[in-house]
Amino acid sequence: KEVSIRGQGSLAYPGLRTQGNLETLSGPNDATRGLTSLADTFEHVIEELLDEQQVIQPSKEHKDADLYSTRVMLSSQVPLEPPLLFLLEEYKNYLDAANMSMRVRRHSDPARRGELSVCDSTSEWVTAAEKKTAVDMSGATVTVLEKVPVPKGQLKQYFYETKCSSKGYAKEGCRGIDKRYWNSQCRTTQSF
C-alpha cells in the first residue's frame, strides 16, 4: 500500500502530493494547485538526490561493488542500445542545443564549422568469444569469462568497445595532419 512515486504530483492528479501511504492521501479537493511543469518536477527530483548526504558503503560481502563499469553488461542476448552513459550524454547535448537560438545553433553545428573526428571509429557490443582478455580499472590484464553462472542458468558478458574504423582515413593517416611533413596513424587504445 506504500506509494513510491517521487515529485510534487502526477498527470492523473495534478498537484497531488504522493508521499505517505494510500490511507493518508488527501482527497481531490486538496489537489487544486494546478499542473506542475515537467522541468519543475525534474528539478525537485534532482534536488532530492543532491540533498541526500548518505554515502553508500559496500558491505563486506560485496566489497567489489565499486568495480562497476558502464561498458560491461551481463545479458542473455546482445543489448539493443549503447550503454546508458552514452545515451545520457547525447540527451545532454540535445538539451544544450534546444536552449540556443536558431542562429547560434546553426553556427555551433560541428559539421557546419568543419569539425571532424581525427580518426573514424565504430562502437559495438562484443562478447568474450571475440575478446579473451580485457584491461580492468587498475590497468591489469585479466581473463574474461565467456559465460557467467547465475541461479537460473548462465549469462553472456558483453563489452561496449570503441575502436578505429577499418575503412576511411585510417590507412592514409589522421585527418588534420599535413601528410607532406608528418606521418600519422589511427590506433585503438585502452581507456577506462
From Swiss-Prot:
<dbReference type="GO" id="GO:0008021">
    <property type="term" value="C:synaptic vesicle"/>
</dbReference>
<dbReference type="GO" id="GO:0038180">
    <property type="term" value="P:nerve growth factor signaling pathway"/>
</dbReference>
<keyword id="KW-1015">Disulfide bond</keyword>
<dbReference type="GO" id="GO:0005615">
    <property type="term" value="C:extracellular space"/>
</dbReference>
<comment type="function">
    <text>Promotes the survival of neuronal populations that are all located either in the central nervous system or directly connected to it.</text>
</comment>
<comment type="similarity">
    <text>Belongs to the NGF-beta family.</text>
</comment>
<dbReference type="InterPro" id="IPR020408">
    <property type="entry name" value="Nerve_growth_factor-like"/>
</dbReference>
<dbReference type="GO" id="GO:0043524">
    <property type="term" value="P:negative regulation of neuron apoptotic process"/>
</dbReference>
<dbReference type="InterPro" id="IPR019846">
    <property type="entry name" value="Nerve_growth_factor_CS"/>
</dbReference>
<dbReference type="GO" id="GO:0050804">
    <property type="term" value="P:modulation of chemical synaptic transmission"/>
</dbReference>
<keyword id="KW-0964">Secreted</keyword>
<keyword id="KW-0339">Growth factor</keyword>
<dbReference type="GO" id="GO:0030424">
    <property type="term" value="C:axon"/>
</dbReference>
<dbReference type="GO" id="GO:0021675">
    <property type="term" value="P:nerve development"/>
</dbReference>
<dbReference type="GO" id="GO:0007169">
    <property type="term" value="P:cell surface receptor protein tyrosine kinase signaling pathway"/>
</dbReference>
<feature type="glycosylation site" description="N-linked (GlcNAc...) asparagine">
    <location>
        <position position="99"/>
    </location>
</feature>
<dbReference type="InterPro" id="IPR029034">
    <property type="entry name" value="Cystine-knot_cytokine"/>
</dbReference>
<feature type="propeptide">
    <location>
        <begin position="1"/>
        <end position="106"/>
    </location>
</feature>
<feature type="disulfide bond">
    <location>
        <begin position="119"/>
        <end position="186"/>
    </location>
</feature>
<dbReference type="InterPro" id="IPR020430">
    <property type="entry name" value="Brain-der_neurotrophic_factor"/>
</dbReference>
<protein>
    <recommendedName>
        <fullName>Neurotrophic factor BDNF precursor form</fullName>
    </recommendedName>
</protein>
<keyword id="KW-0165">Cleavage on pair of basic residues</keyword>
<dbReference type="GO" id="GO:0030425">
    <property type="term" value="C:dendrite"/>
</dbReference>
<dbReference type="GO" id="GO:0008083">
    <property type="term" value="F:growth factor activity"/>
</dbReference>
<dbReference type="GO" id="GO:0005163">
    <property type="term" value="F:nerve growth factor receptor binding"/>
</dbReference>
<keyword id="KW-0325">Glycoprotein</keyword>
<dbReference type="InterPro" id="IPR002072">
    <property type="entry name" value="Nerve_growth_factor-rel"/>
</dbReference>
<dbReference type="GO" id="GO:0048812">
    <property type="term" value="P:neuron projection morphogenesis"/>
</dbReference>
<dbReference type="Pfam" id="PF00243">
    <property type="entry name" value="NGF"/>
</dbReference>
